[in-house]
Amino acid sequence: MDLERYKEQERRRLDSLLRDRGASPEERRASIQKLRLRQNEYMHDRYNALLTGPAEFWIESERMERYERRQLLGDLWAEGEIAVLGGRSGIGKSIFAVHLATALAAGEAFGPYPAAEPRRVLYVDLDSSPELFARRYSRNVDGRPAPYEFPEGFLRSVFEWDTPLPPGYESMESLIFDSIIESAANNNCRTIIIDSLPQIAAHGKQRNLIDFLLRFKWLRDSGKASILLIAETTPVGRTPDAVSHDIAGPGIVKSVADSIFTLSPRRRSPHV
């Protein structure tokens, strides 16, 4: 088929799809997916590597793709996205993340956010010692500590920072990333929470952290995971109590994120 004839056929398919207002969301989504497959095949044609269509098509296509993604934390985090949770040290980011992971694994609502389907969640805890985690999530029952009952789908991973680098590894960040991928695959987890980026940065170099984040961007783009990264914030301004804060670390943190949200104390109350 010659190039001009192909373009004309694709233009007619796009026009027909956009005019079909009576089709159900499922039918339109299926049509868009088929059209994308055809365009992806054509993308490698030696004549033209661009995918071209009416502006409305791209909006509709993205809307349908977003429609398929389930929300994990309202509009703040959805399936197939990288979200960054920021906050100053000691604000409660880890506790927030553990409670969120628990809700996701149990398929329960989390505060004002509606419940998602139960899922297996890999919580990579690089911050808390075993003693701290046990103390935080135990309660006193008849004078004895009783551990909190987590849902079966909540999985916690820890990393021994004194682990020597195996042959073939040049950075601790690469070892951590590969270990996360291996653990997620072995335990059938597609929802991953990393707690935290500052801990990784403290044990490595900034250029290795950048590579670490870019590999997570690749993981997201491959459609294989939903990722929540825990980060620190620094005050913006000259005073320590500045209201505005920014995500600490290299700028790549903000560029790979689909959304960024923070925990902060209320202005009229010390509580979050």
Regions inferred by a protein language model and the residue ranges of each:
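N-terminal pre-Walker A segment at the start of P-loop NTPase domains
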Residues: 45-72
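Hydrophobic positions on the alpha1 helix immediately C-terminal to the Walker A/P-loop
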Residues: 96, 100
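Phosphate-binding/switch region of NTP-binding enzymes
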Residues: 84-85, 90, 95, 191, ...
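Pre-Walker A (Motif I) flank of P-loop NTPase domains
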Residues: 79-83, 119
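Conserved inter-motif catalytic segment of the P-loop NTP-binding fold
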Residues: 67, 89, 115-211, 218
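Short gly/ser/thr-rich secondary-structure transition/capping motifs
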Residues: 63-70, 174, 241-244
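Short, small/acidic-rich helices and loops at N termini and domain boundaries
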Residues: 1-50
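Gly/Ala-rich phosphate-binding loop of Rossmann-like dinucleotide-binding domains
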Residues: 105, 109
